[in-house]
């Protein structure tokens, strides 16, 4: 009988100069994983929290990508680049505008809340079937998409012209590079991101993150398994129901949800609720259940091997 494969969530600290996909590939090979995938790309020059779903957990990765993110970054005032970060080509400089700390604080506050943000020219978003960065490299101009994002908070950490350190908690889809560029334009001097570090993704912060070196050390003796967040805990932001009835659980393992149990519990949730965790008495994730699917064609149950 094949040994049960480990499933759960790894919280990694992505190093500078590596793509998110490359880090996942290395960890997957290092740990001998069958499946692995990350939840939210970090630019190669950026560092910090990268969530990686392992084996069965890849089946709920979409439930993690929408969580709020926290970033700390250093912006360089007075210089704009085509990529909006230090990896790009300088397109504009302005050293005759030196904002005061008060002006900077006022501008930062104006960026809090819900806003429509333009997607940067150098981004992986597709337009006309092509990624924006591919079109930008070819010199092809297109109308850039715009997205509604929410800046929960935007804090000034330190300021010594021309460098300013900022921290933000923001919604899914927020481009920090664009946030810095917009701030620079509001100040009248322009700006680009020099350093970017993701401090947290949802409830998972750097204090729980492991480096690639730590994963390498833990691969030889299996100690990396202690870093694996159980699937039910990885989805702690979702509501949960515990199944203690052995017969109901037995049917669930075969992809069938007891009709009486479903009728009894569906009324506990509003029609706006998404998936609900169904967990065993000992806290393991048995399934995701949609009590109120958005359409009659949507699957209502996603079962996981115990």
From Swiss-Prot:
Its EC number is 5.4.99.25. SUPFAM superfamilies: Pseudouridine synthase. Gene3D superfamilies: Pseudouridine synthase. One of its GO terms (molecular function) is tRNA pseudouridine(55) synthase activity. The active site is at 43 (nucleophile). Keywords: Isomerase, tRNA processing. InterPro entries: PsdUridine_synth_cat_dom_sf (IPR020103), PsdUridine_synth_N (IPR002501), tRNA_psdUridine_synth_TruB (IPR014780), TruB_C (IPR032819). One of its GO terms (biological process) is mRNA pseudouridine synthesis. The keyword Transferase does not apply. It catalyses: uridine(55) in tRNA = pseudouridine(55) in tRNA. The keyword tRNA processing applies. Responsible for synthesis of pseudouridine from uracil-55 in the psi GC loop of transfer RNAs. Belongs to the pseudouridine synthase TruB family. Type 1 subfamily. This is tRNA pseudouridine synthase B. The lineage of its organism: Bacteria, Pseudomonadati, Thermodesulfobacteriota, Syntrophobacteria, Syntrophobacterales. The gene is truB.
């Amino acid at each position: 009988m094949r040994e049960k494969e480990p499933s759960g969530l790894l919280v990694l600290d992505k190093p500078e100069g590596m793509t998110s996909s490359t880090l996942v590939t290395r960890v997957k090979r290092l740990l001998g994983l069958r499946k692995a995938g990350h939840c939210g790309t970090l630019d190669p020059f950026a560092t910090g929290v990268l969530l990686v779903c392992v084996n069965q957990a890849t089946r709920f990765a979409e439930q993690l990508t929408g969580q709020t993110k926290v970033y700390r970054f250093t912006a360089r005032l007075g210089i704009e680049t085509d990529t909006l970060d230090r990896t790009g080509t300088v397109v504009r400089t302005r050293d005759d505008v030196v904002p005061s700390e008060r002006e900077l604080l006022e501008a930062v506050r104006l960026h809090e809340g819900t806003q429509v943000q333009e997607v940067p020219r150098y981004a992986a978003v597709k337009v006309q079937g092509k990624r924006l960065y591919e079109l930008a490299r070819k010199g092809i101009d297109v109308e850039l998409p715009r997205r509604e994002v929410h800046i929960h908070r935007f804090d000034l950490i330190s300021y010594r012209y021309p460098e300013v350190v900022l921290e933000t908690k923001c919604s899914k889809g927020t481009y920090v590079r664009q946030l810095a560029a917009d701030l620079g334009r509001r100040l009248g001097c322009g700006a680009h991101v020099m350093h970017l570090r993701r401090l947290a993704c949802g409830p998972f912060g750097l204090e729980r993150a492991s480096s690639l070196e730590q994963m390498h050390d833990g691969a030889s003796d299996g100690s990396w398994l202690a870093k694996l967040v159980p699937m039910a805990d990885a989805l702690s932001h979702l509501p949960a129901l515990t199944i203690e009835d052995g017969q109901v659980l037995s049917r669930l393992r075969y992809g069938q949800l007891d009709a009486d149990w479903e009728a009894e519990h569906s009324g506990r949730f509003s029609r706006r609720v998404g998936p609900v965790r169904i967990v065993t008495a000992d806290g393991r994730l048995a399934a995701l259940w949609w009590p109120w699917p958005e359409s009659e064609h949507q699957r209502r149950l996603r079962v996981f091997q115990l």
